[in-house]
Amino acid sequence: MDHRELWPYGLRVLVIDDDCSYLSVMEDLLLKCSYKVTTYKNVREAVPFILDNPQIVDLVISDAFFPTEDGLLILQEVTSKFGIPTVIMASSGDTNTVMKYVANGAFDFLLKPVRIEELSNIWQHIFRKQMQDHKNNNMVGNLEKPGHPPSILAMARATPATTRSTATEASLAPLENEVRDDMVNYNGEITDIRDLGKSRLTWTTQLHRQFIAAVNHLGEDKAVPKKILGIMKVKHLTREQVASHLQKYRMQLKKSIPTTSKHGATLSSTALDKTQDHPSRSQYFNQDGCKEIMDYSLPRDDLSSGSECMLEELNDYSSEGFQDFRWDSDKQEYGPCFWNF
């Protein structure tokens, strides 16, 4: 396959500018980026073309056409009917002008002369628009399923690294992270274990926080894997994985809390020091895992064979691998955190 058939090569861009000379310059620059270019010098001719052929236009770049409002006309027509990302360009761009176009739906505002580096990255606007549409329609899980067109991310990943431009390669990584962020709900919680993008489960800081929140909610006597799993509500996370994590969590607590109180609860030396300084303060892990443990243990019952699950070979359960959040009530800052079990 010709590498120019791979995305973002072949991106279909419609350019509108009443300055014929600059329209030719823009066409040359876009062709150098391996985009397919259609040009119009009149907005009122371009709009009917877009309305008749929305499927062959990926992005519109339009001059602002000062002092008329033609730029706003095409912006409103295109965005309201088809949601095609539109970029406005102009020779000058005061704050009020930029705000006017952005408020009316412009994805970007470019100052003339437009640099080729800016044009080589305009595909990001299409990418973000596609991801936002899927997010709004709750279709993130269907991006790669049969019956749906391949997502832009999939096409970008399919492009061999040797054929990607430097700008494309550099900009793809943060956008992949953007996609991953879209697969977490608005509260920042993980809702599907597959969204971690790992072939085997890794207990990330956020996933562990949700685990701790569930344990604290249930209390010492009722914190068993099945109930923890029910509260966490993470798709494809299994009871065995929770059981294994709970078991190793308890084992690590024993290692990190060697001193025994007269009531039978185990306290770390640090926790004891803090207790002496603030005898009325209760120390425990909150949902962010941000406090030390005091008078807290987990039940031994209902631990299944999950201790043999895949987490064991993937993660490190040594004392070096487990560091809890340290909460300084005076400084109000977090220390390091590695939840490697």
UniProtKB/Swiss-Prot annotation:
Disulfide bonds: none annotated. It comes from Oryza sativa subsp. japonica. Residues 12-127 form the Response regulatory domain. One of its GO terms (cellular component) is nucleus. The modification 4-aspartylphosphate is found at D63. SMART domains: REC. CDD domains: REC_typeB_ARR-like. GO terms for biological process: cytokinin-activated signaling pathway; flower development; phosphorelay signal transduction system; positive regulation of short-day photoperiodism, flowering. NCBIfam families: myb_SHAQKYF (TIGR01557). This is Two-component response regulator ORR30. Two-component system major event consists of a His-to-Asp phosphorelay between a sensor histidine kinase (HK) and a response regulator (RR). In plants, the His-to-Asp phosphorelay involves an additional intermediate named Histidine-containing phosphotransfer protein (HPt). This multistep phosphorelay consists of a His-Asp-His-Asp sequential transfer of a phosphate group between first a His and an Asp of the HK protein, followed by the transfer to a conserved His of the HPt protein and finally the transfer to an Asp in the receiver domain of the RR protein. The gene is EHD1. It holds the Pfam family Response_reg. Residues 225-250 bind DNA. InterPro entries: ARR-like, CheY-like_superfamily, Homeodomain-like_sf, Myb_dom, Myb_dom_plants, Response_reg_B-typ_pln, SANT/Myb, Sig_transdc_resp-reg_receiver. Residues 195-254 form the HTH myb-type domain.
